[in-house]
Every structure is written in C-alpha cells, then in structure tokens.
Amino acid sequence: MLESPDVAGRAASALAETMPAHVTRAAFHSIAIELPPGRLSSAEVAARLEISEEWILSRTGIHERPMAGPDERLSDYAARAGAAALARAGVDGSELDLVLVATISADEVTPNTAPLVAHALGAHRAGAFDIGSACTGFLSAVAIAAAAIESGRARWVLVVGADFITRMINWEDRKSAALFGDAAGAAVLGPADGEHGVIGPIVLGADGSNGETIMIPNPERKIVMDGPEVYKHAVARMAESTLTALDRSGMTIDDIDLFVYHQANARITQALGERLGVEPERVVDCIAHYGNSSAATLPLALASAERDGRLKPGARVVLGAFGGGFTWGGGVIEWGASGDA
C-alpha cells in the first residue's frame, strides 16, 4: 500500500495536530464541477435495453445522468472545471506547479489530458500528467498532490477527475449499461493556512489478480463487468481502507461528520454505510441525478454536499473509492473550502 506521510499525534481534536510541525500541511482550497447539458434518463435507458425503469431504479438508484454529445471533448470539460476551481480558490493558472487529471476516457491515447488542461489554464510552468486508476483516480491524485505539497515540491496543485463513460457503455450488458454518466470535477489543493482545513492520511491499495472483473478491453473499449464480484470487493475494500485511514488519524467512525464515497450505485453506498455502522444522513448519496462517472464521482459528491450545506468548513470527512484494477483507497480530511460549487 502507498500511504501519505506518517502522522505524529493520535489526538482526535484536529487532523492538523497529527502531523509533524515541520511538514507543510496540504488542504483543499476549492471544489468545482462541469456537467454536459445533455441528460439521459433511466426511462430512455430502459427503453433501449427493453427492461422496466423500475428495474433500473431498484438496482442502481439512478434516475438520470449527464451525457456528453458526440462532438464534445473531455479535455474541454476538464479545463472548464479546473478554471472554475481556480477562480473559487483565487489562484491563477500560472501559479500552478502540478496538474493531475484522473481519467480513463481521454480524447486521445496521447497526449494526456493533463497537458491540454494545463495549457488551457495558462499553467505553463506546471508538470502535468494523467492518472488511470479508474474510479479511484481522483483520490489517487489527491494523495499524490498532498505528498507533493507536504514535501515542498509543489505549492499549488490542480486535481481533476473527469470521464465520459457513456461512450464506453456495453449495451449488450443490461446490468452495467444503466450505471454510467459523464462529468468533470476539479479541486485546487495548496498549503493549509488555518482556514482551509487539512488533508490527513490517505491509504491506497491494489490487487491486479481481479483485473478481469471490471475492464475496458482494447480495441472494443466497452465495459466488461462482473457486477456481483465488484459489489463484494468494493464494499469490503472501501470499508477496510476507511478503518485504516481513521486509525492512522487517531479518529473513529463517531468523529466523522460526512462519509463521501465513490458513487458506484446506491446499493454499494448503502451497504458500505451499514457495514461501518454509519447513519444514512452522514453518507453522501448523489447518484440519482449523476450516475457513475468514474473518476468524477468524488468531486461531484463533495460539490453536491457543499452546495446543499452538508459540507461546511471544519467538517471532518472520510473519502473512499474503489475501481478497476482492482484499485481502492480511503482518506480523512478536514474541510475548509466554501462557496457555491
């Protein structure tokens, strides 16, 4: 497992106090999202799959999802989400040291999406690269960004999670075809300044022995997924990484205000909360109107919770994700970003 630097204290009063004094603490300074205007309803999906809409709703909790048009480019949405996040953080693109884009649906195999986003935002001195760990991508990027800030190698980092997954739907597989949507979300990470919370321990893991359980093979580039196996491993791994991250932060389930997990489907989110003994009101569930947009679901969930007033400065938050590979992760943060997402 790859872990963020060891914390020094075990007190649950504040994550900032659990890190050595000489470490530059990293924090979220903003969150923003960008959605395609097109919508694909579950009624439309049901008609195409020749099943009932109720069948979809009962198994996924998804009523509709954003859907990009055939001529729209993922890099444009990633750049717009990034621009909104920069504006909300009061940071200019030229100040960025690093641009990370988590995606498995880039416009081209090469160049990566991140250099295109960096160019669009005027981040001409920033390093830029993509992270392809599927639905875990955004959390993986946050871990890398936090490590760069904490080590002094970067001050401002833009983290983007963006995917157009509807283009990869396998319409022959009704169990997975109803799940996916398109979206982009972005966050600006920088040094904690007392007003923007702090990023605590992030624990990442992977198991390639299950790689064929969910995959997008070449050249077909259509999703192949064993839903029951994904469900079983997703719940177990996200619960495990949540508890590990909490232990490393010196916190418990009761210390956390919100649990923000990858929005795979409503059943997984519900089962995860039940396994951890968390009341539903503390678990963010926004999949009904977004669907599963892979690397974009965590920023979507954070922005949704902030917009609804559930995510406030000072809130202690667990982040968790699970994706193809398998890859997974869990982390603990104190929130500080504010404003309309």
Where are these predicted regions, by residue range?
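Short beta-strand segments
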Residues: 29-32, 102, 132, 157-163, ...
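Flexible, glycine-rich active-site loops centered on histidine and acidic residues
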Residues: 148-183
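Claisen-condensing/thiolase-fold acyl-transfer catalytic domains that form or cleave C-C bonds
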Residues: 2-8, 75, 79-86, 105-106, ...
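Anion-binding (especially nucleotide phosphate/pyrophosphate-binding) glycine-rich loop
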Residues: 88, 92-124
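Short glycine-rich phosphate-binding loop at a beta-alpha junction
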Residues: 94-102, 253-262
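Short, well-ordered amphipathic alpha-helical segments that serve as non-catalytic structural scaffolds
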Residues: 52, 74-89, 113, 233-249, ...
